[in-house]
Amino acid sequence: MDGVYLYLKLLEQRAPHARQTWELLEWNGGGANSSGVGIANIDSCGNVHPDQFWQTHNLGNVRERPFSAIWTDNADPLLTGLRNRLPLLTGRCATCRWQETCGGSFRVRALQATGDPWAPDPACYLTDEEIA
């Protein structure tokens, strides 16, 4: 959501580099290339998590299996969901026009706030008008 917000502000200010900013967001995958996709965490005990904030969700241990085997194992429903999250998103995230770039923002925050990792990110500061 941060990248989208920045892009919208640049458009609002008619900044000459707004288009280039958008192209970089698309190239990098924005927030959609985050937890469980482009980010992982291995804690001091060797446990693998979707990122450093998912400490309560263990995908495996690198002392027992190679990281590559853990990271490419599609048996974990949360990891599979994080990698294919768009159809799972609910609420305003499900209808947000920026979901391809934002990726529903921070899924662990949604989980901690609502008990549902696919619920809207409660910290999304984009207005309803901005996401419509």
Predicted features by range, described:
Residues M1-W22, N47-R97, G103:
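C-terminal accessory region of radical SAM enzymes
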Residues L25-W27:
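Conserved short histidine dyad/triad with adjacent acidic residue
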Residues N33-G36:
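Short, small/polar residue-rich loop motifs at catalytic or cofactor-binding pockets
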Residues S44:
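A cytosolic small-molecule/anion-sensing beta-strand core signal
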Residues P87-I131:
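Cysteine-cluster motifs in flexible loop/terminal segments that predominantly coordinate metals
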